[in-house]
Regions:
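Short aromatic/basic micro-patch
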Residues: 20, 59, 90, 139, ...
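A short C-terminal helix-loop "cap" of Rossmann-like NAD(P)-dependent dehydrogenase/epimerase domains
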Residues: 39-50, 106, 142-143
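Mid/C-terminal beta-alpha module of Rossmann-like enzyme folds, strongest
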Residues: 71-129, 158, 162-165, 172-175
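Glycine-rich Rossmann NAD(P)(H)-binding loop
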Residues: 28, 50-55, 83-90, 99-105, ...
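Substrate-positioning beta->alpha
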Residues: 2, 31-37, 51-74, 80-84
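Active-site Tyr-X1-5-Lys
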Residues: 1-19
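Conserved C-terminal active-site "lid" loop/helix of NAD(P)H-dependent oxidoreductases
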Residues: 62, 95-98, 121-152, 163
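Flexible, glycine-rich beta-alpha linker
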Residues: 16-37
Length: 175
């Protein structure tokens, strides 16, 4: 039994209302893991072979997630529903690098390499999964959440990236 089915069962047994939010990668000042690695790489100005990637990625800024949770807690129509949630602006990996560079106030250094070549080299180096995440698509349509609950994210993708980049640059200055 999946986690959603368990929650629905608990709701049926107890009468407790539930709301399930499915979310993509969250970015936030203080971010770590792969997103931090991408910030570091873009900030160093290294040329990246990511130009022309035609994937589609959804992201969610932590401020938008917090606001959406407040909306869910206050809105009676949210009860016992499942919603997909994102910033609402899907981007390719290439576009994400460009937006991060803009937030860092540096030029994006992208060049094109055939995707097959990158995948082959990644396979030899044992990095296929990491490259698959860079090239793959993962997007969520949050239109139902917006329509049902009248939600408008308080932060655009660029605003969230600006706040995250500002944190990153301050952390470099402050050690």
């Amino acid at each position: 039994m999946g986690s959603r089915a368990r929650l629905v069962g608990i709701s049926a047994e107890t009468g407790m209302q539930i709301v399930i939010l499915r979310i993509p990668l969250i970015y936030v000042p203080g971010v770590g893991a792969n997103f931090l690695q991408l910030l570091q790489t873009v900030n160093k100005g290294w040329p990246l072979p990511l130009r022309g990637i035609a994937n589609r990625r959804s992201l969610l800024y932590s401020g938008n997630l917090a606001d959406a949770i407040l909306v869910v807690l206050k809105h009676p129509d949210a009860a016992n529903k499942l919603y997909l949630l994102s910033d609402g602006q899907d981007v390719s990996t290439s576009q994400l690098v460009e937006l991060i560079a803009k937030a860092l106030k540096i030029p994006a250094r992208l060049f094109g390499v055939p995707q097959g070549l990158i995948l082959a080299v990644a396979g030899v180096l044992g990095k296929s999964r990491a490259v698959d995440r860079l090239f793959g698509s993962l997007y969520l349509d949050s239109a139902k959440f917006r329509q049902d609950l009248g939600w408008v994210p308080p932060f655009s993708l660029q605003e969230g990236l600006n706040k995250t980049a500002s944190w990153y640059q301050n952390s470099l200055r402050n050690g």
